[in-house]
Every structure is written in structure tokens, then in C-alpha cells.
Amino acid sequence: MSQTPVATTPRNYPIFTVRWLALHTLGVPTVFFLGALAAMQFIRR
């Protein structure tokens, strides 16, 4: 997957790809949710 010829065809691989959108729409809320759960562990009285 990391062997894609980016140097020969730079215009076929923009920044916002389907894989980029899928990773960030799943990853960003997941990391935020895990961070919120971890932060809640320290709020206990």
C-alpha cells in the first residue's frame, strides 16, 4: 500500500482522498471520545 508511485503521478493523489476522509471521520471522534473517557477518570471526588 505504501508502494504507490506518487512521484510519477502526483496529481492523482490529492490531500483529501476517500481513505483520508474515512480515517479522519472514524479516527478523530474515536480519539476525542477516548480522551474524554480518560479525562473523566480524574474528575472523581
From Swiss-Prot:
UniProt main location, coarse: membrane
Molecular-function GO term, any one: heme binding
Cellular compartment(s): Cellular thylakoid membrane
One Pfam family from the record: Cytochrom_B559
SUPFAM superfamilies (UniProt xref): Cytochrome b559 subunits (SSF161045)
UniProt topology in membrane: Single-pass membrane protein
Record-linked InterPro entries: PSII_cyt_b559_bsu, PSII_cyt_b559_CS, PSII_cyt_b559_N
Ranges that cross the membrane: 20-36
PROSITE patterns xref list: CYTOCHROME_B559
Swiss-Prot/TrEMBL cofactor(s): heme b
Cofactor binding notes: With its partner (PsbE) binds heme. PSII binds additional chlorophylls, carotenoids and specific lipids.
GO biological process assignments: photosynthetic electron transport chain
A single cellular component GO annotation: photosystem II reaction center
Keywords: Electron transport, Heme, Iron, Membrane, Metal-binding, Photosynthesis, Photosystem II, Thylakoid, Transmembrane, Transmembrane helix, Transport
Residues binding heme: 24
Function, in words: This b-type cytochrome is tightly associated with the reaction center of photosystem II (PSII). PSII is a light-driven water:plastoquinone oxidoreductase that uses light energy to abstract electrons from H(2)O, generating O(2) and a proton gradient subsequently used for ATP formation. It consists of a core antenna complex that captures photons, and an electron transfer chain that converts photonic excitation into a charge separation.
NCBIfam families: cyt_b559_beta
Quaternary structure and partners: Heterodimer of an alpha subunit and a beta subunit. PSII is composed of 1 copy each of membrane proteins PsbA, PsbB, PsbC, PsbD, PsbE, PsbF, PsbH, PsbI, PsbJ, PsbK, PsbL, PsbM, PsbT, PsbX, PsbY, PsbZ, Psb30/Ycf12, peripheral proteins PsbO, CyanoQ (PsbQ), PsbU, PsbV and a large number of cofactors. It forms dimeric complexes.
Family listed: Belongs to the PsbE/PsbF family.
Name of this protein: Cytochrome b559 subunit beta
Native source organism of the sequence: Parasynechococcus marenigrum (strain WH8102)
Phylogenetic lineage: Bacteria, Bacillati, Cyanobacteriota, Cyanophyceae, Synechococcales
Annotated gene: psbF
